[in-house]
């Protein structure tokens, strides 16, 4: 919570609405990191500490994200990548490019662990080397097309779709394998990790999800000398689908 300051502020505001135990608070009446805030969240989620339904949903959402971001994950898998580019050389201004990546993780590990009857965690998921391994299918596709318009201008189009589906030993996708939105190479109206998921209000500094759709189109042109300009539109977002997380 020292890093996720927005999440801390949200929980801290909620705690100030109630008769929170003084042992959870510092001299400024703020939740102590990590002991105070962890204890407060634990009691709210387990319903030992009564709050409104709206506050409970907010705390429960932040707790799910905390567990997802801080949990240890063992990822054993393989991937296949394909790329097809029509560009002949660096001076070719009219070209297209298609990329495809498929990643499958945890299947062989799951088969082996079931045969060996390995230990399980508190949720009944198999563990290997003391860690719950991830099992998922992830695909990414991207397409780029450039069209020259005259000598010093062109139109550039890019689209991307990605989805990661957990199954078997997993209910969600590890943070390192999830998608994010925003930033200078994505949806430029938002800072990196600040957009989504879905229509949520971005309670966290690092918002991620397991499905992403992005598209942008640009008109690039020469202004003067080495000074170039561009007019662009960006579309897209991230969403949580087929997992245990709701937007």
Predicted regions and their residues:
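C-terminal outer-membrane beta-barrel translocator/porin domains of Gram-negative envelope proteins
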Residues: 2-221, 226, 231-235, 239-242, ...
């Amino acid at each position: 919570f020292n890093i996720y300051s927005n999440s801390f502020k949200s929980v801290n505001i909620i705690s100030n609405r109630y008769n929170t135990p003084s042992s959870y608070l510092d001299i400024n009446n703020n939740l102590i990191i990590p002991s105070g805030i962890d204890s407060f969240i634990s009691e709210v989620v387990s319903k030992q500490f009564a709050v409104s339904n709206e506050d409970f949903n907010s705390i429960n959402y932040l707790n799910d994200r905390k567990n997802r971001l801080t949990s240890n994950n063992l990822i054993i898998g393989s991937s296949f990548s394909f790329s097809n580019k029509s560009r002949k050389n660096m001076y070719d201004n009219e070209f297209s490019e298609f990329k495809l990546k498929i990643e499958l993780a945890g299947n062989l590990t799951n088969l082996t662990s079931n045969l060996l009857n390995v230990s399980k965690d508190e949720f009944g998921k198999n563990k290997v080397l003391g860690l719950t391994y991830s099992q998922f299918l992830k695909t990414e596709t991207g397409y780029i097309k450039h069209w020259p318009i005259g000598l010093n201008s062109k139109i550039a189009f890019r689209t991307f779709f990605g989805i990661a589906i957990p199954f078997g030993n997993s209910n969600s996708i590890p943070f390192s394998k999830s998608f994010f939105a925003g930033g200078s190479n994505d949806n430029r109206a938002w800072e990196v990790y600040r957009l989504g998921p879905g229509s949520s209000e971005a309670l966290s500094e690092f918002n991620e999800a397991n499905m992403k759709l992005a598209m942008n189109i640009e008109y690039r042109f020469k202004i003067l000398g080495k000074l170039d300009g561009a007019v662009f539109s960006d579309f897209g977002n991230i969403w949580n689908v087929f997992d245990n997380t709701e937007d």
